[in-house]
């Protein structure tokens, strides 16, 4: 079999990934009072905080950096935590008036949960943007904004679309900017 024939056969035999279906479903779910209330609660947490810290691991870490910068552009003091092993040493005097925004598809990553628990020990607030309300992260957070995307894996790597996360981050930043 020639390489071109093999590639053509492979192309037709593999199911095509269409991100539009889950994204359309997500956007439909955002057009309701429950989602608007979650956004209002999250916006209030951001506006009440003296500082906002974003945290995620892997792709979620890259989006945490983006979210931090985007929120800073809206006039909020915001930083991202890039190292999941950062010894937080959270004391109430340091984090009591701050917010940790945690991005995680699974909501179950051990290192991420350890950071959240340390942060909460210092009386900081936690906003989780995660794929499900049934994760450990969701149970720990003060406010959870779920996005319910079908999980896509490549071995141990997570390829779940992050379009809803970007949508939520940008929407929150715009709401915060308008509220100031």
Region locations from a protein language model:
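HTH-adjacent hinge/linker in prokaryotic transcriptional regulators
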Residues: 1-38
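A ubiquitous structural signal for well-ordered alpha-helices
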Residues: 23-26, 30, 42-45, 67, ...
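Glycine-rich phosphate/diphosphate-binding loops that line cofactor/substrate pockets in enzymes
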Residues: 37-49
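Glycine-rich phosphate-binding loops that contact phosphosugars or nucleotide phosphates
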Residues: 47-180
